[in-house]
A protein has these predicted regions:
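Short amphipathic C-terminal alpha-helix that caps PH/PH-like domains
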Residues: 88-91, 95, 161-166
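N-terminal leader or domain-start segments enriched in small/polar residues
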Residues: 1-79, 93-111
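Internal, well-ordered alpha/beta segment that forms a basic, Gly-enriched binding/recognition surface
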Residues: 103-186
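Conserved small/polar residues in nucleotide/adenosyl-binding loops
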Residues: 187-194
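Non-catalytic, well-ordered alpha-helical scaffold segments
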Residues: 25, 54, 89, 155-159, ...
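Short, charged/polar micro-motifs that form catalytic or ligand-binding hotspots
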Residues: 46, 81, 147-151
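General alpha-helical segment detector with a strong preference for membrane-spanning helices
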Residues: 87-88, 194
């Protein structure tokens, strides 16, 4: 029984998390400023269609809880997205300025035009700039849950977390799987050198 407890305690020491509530505006600003890497090598590309993006935006407007965004802290203090690329990219696609670096990072020049909304039908066919200023401010100030894996955590944990959080979602392409494995091997090699 003591072996079980010591194994659990040893593994728990490898993981160190922090939790935050951050506004949509803060997150977009952090991506713009290069403080959040929205597409680390092991992460999938932005794939959600307009309907799925619109449903997320509607949920945020309505105050319906959305899953936390999971980030890993790099040694330089920047964050990289472990889980939530689709959600964060959708938010950027809807609310980021047209010529912003955040929009360029998701490779979407034309802002999301909401569609298929069932609760907020009058929002359909509108983009962020078409909304009244009060609604724009309301959206930008909405808080989202952020969980960050600190840089004190074992480097292999971020790949374990990525795998656990992404099981059952949109299937990774063969190239995304290869990128994840290659990045994991590089991190493992770097960790061995440390």
């Amino acid at each position: 029984m003591e072996d079980i407890n010591s194994e659990l305690n040893e593994q728990k020491r490898k993981v160190d998390f922090n939790s935050y509530d951050m506004s949509v505006k803060e997150l977009i600003s952090m991506v713009n400023d290069g403080l959040i890497d929205i597409a680390p090598e092991y992460q999938r590309q932005f794939r959600w269609d307009a309907l799925r993006q619109s449903t997320l935006i509607e949920s945020i407007f309505l105050g319906i809880p959305v899953p936390s965004l999971f980030m890993a802290t790099n040694p330089d203090g920047t964050w990289e997205v472990i889980d939530g690329v689709q959600r964060l990219s959708s938010i950027i696609n809807f609310a980021a300025e047209k010529d912003s670096s955040a929009r360029k990072k998701i490779k979407k020049e034309i802002p999301l035009q909401l569609c298929g909304l069932k609760k907020m039908k009058s929002f359909n066919e509108k983009d962020f700039k078409c909304l009244p200023r009060s609604l724009q401010i309301d959206f930008l100030l909405k808080p989202l849950k952020i969980t960050t894996l600190s840089d004190k955590s074992d480097k292999s944990i971020r790949f374990d977390l990525f795998e656990r959080l992404n099981t059952g979602g949109i299937k990774l392409s063969d190239q995304e799987i290869r990128s994840c494995i290659f990045s994991c091997l590089l991190y493992t090699s770097d960790a061995a050198d440390d």
